[in-house]
């Protein structure tokens, strides 16, 4: 059963406030300095169109403005959120800018601002031929109410009896309302068996997940009777808001559970029971942005499957086939994930390995060879450098086998084991086409890595059945090896074929793939930091570009 019309819209990781300054702008006014204003545009993932998001105020007579009006953006770590900042000289009397008043522009992703040192970046303005346009300075700040965590406990009384041979097995489902009137599921309680008066365990939920920062937004709560076959029986519903829930810090709050169908059919219908909010508290916690702002770097490593089951790279049927018109599935997956994660790595150097190939000249089989053929330094410069090394390896190595994951997992784990202060977190992307040959060793490697600052993303390409991969993705059952369970869930698996867009819109389908494989990374990083009691370091002190001294006459 699908629970109550939940949409697939994700809750933003947080809300980010962008502060804008400019330095050394073009001077277009004859008798005074320019009167600048900045316009922010965001890019639609679907159409790639730029849409105006907002404008700063106009500041008169300056080439070095520090704008007061800020931009507040929803931030999704797992998405490439492209921004464009256009700077204009504005006639302050009419507040109108003309094309000739264009002072320059800058393009960058929101992740680049957050991933900059202290969540600050400075970019050169361009767009006016033959002119130096100056620079734009951007600072990202997380809104404080986005770090709040609500903890609450509820009980119910005299719920409707739904089971023929016993009482109900009730549970609650929480939904956040969206601006378009739909609802998104945001929490489910546990099932309390065989009772009409359940007391549920206390639970915690980010306030942003409950109401997206809008304290008066409707929160709908459905009450269900659990059934083994999944056809859970609807008992009733009630609505509230974060603001109303928070009143329970001082008093119990009782809600009537109403079943609209029963209410219409039965004149004497009163309710289907009541739910009482027993306790409610709010605490703040450190967020993903806190750690990134404090200097935590995401170290991205790539491992690519070079086994023979991929097919001859020279043949169009191969998963590694390099068409002049289209990237291979391997290259598309690598580009989609890497282009987002690189914003959080200051040196943009990425170790990249292959596994399952015979290497020249003697034909040695390797399960962790550097794609750039440099054993001393496997780093590639940027995602383009990784792709270049991958294409070069396809021309020089012989695809072979078997498919071993453990060597490359252990390789990254050895590097992660040297970091214990929260300064670095490792993300390993494995792209593969088939069945793992070293399942036992891979499970052992994952269990060992689960105590380290490390996450593993697996993208399965091709038509193979990936049951073994699903087993490694510990969403339902925690991975175990020799009776030892993984300390944390650190693996995320997705099959590439689920993201092949029949309409041919590769940009959108690869954005969806990146979104799904990266969505769990912030929480996995936070779970590691929490279990080790590692607090984010304070951001480095602000060091803005000084306002140039006025020219001497």
UniProtKB/Swiss-Prot annotation:
Residues where Ca(2+) 2 binds: 163, 225, 227, 233
Keyword Phosphoprotein in record: no
Region of interest (Disordered), residue spans: 531-553
Disulfide pattern: none
Gene Ontology BP annotations: cell differentiation; cellular response to calcium ion; positive regulation of dendrite extension
Residue intervals of the VWFA domain: 299-500
Gene3D superfamilies, A to Z: C2 domain
Binding sites annotated in the UniProt record for Ca(2+) 1: 163, 169, 225, 227
Cofactor list: Ca(2+)
Tissues expressing this chain: Expressed in melanocytes.
One annotated GO molecular function: calcium-dependent phospholipid binding
Domain C2, chain residue ranges per copy: 1-125, 132-255
Keywords annotated in UniProt: Calcium, Differentiation, Glycoprotein, Metal-binding, Repeat
Glycosylation sites per record: 95
Matching InterPro entries: C2_dom (IPR000008), C2_domain_sf (IPR035892), C2B_Copine (IPR037768), Copine (IPR045052), Copine_C (IPR010734), VWF_A (IPR002035), vWFA_dom_sf (IPR036465)
Keyword Metal-binding: yes
Top-rank lineage group of the source organism: Eukaryota
GO cellular component: extracellular exosome; extracellular space; plasma membrane
Classification via Pfam families: C2, Copine
Coiled-coil segments on the chain, per record: none
Function: Probable calcium-dependent phospholipid-binding protein that may play a role in calcium-mediated intracellular processes. Plays a role in dendrite formation by melanocytes.
Family membership: Belongs to the copine family.
Name of the molecule in the record: Copine-9
Taxonomic lineage from the root: Eukaryota, Metazoa, Chordata, Craniata, Vertebrata
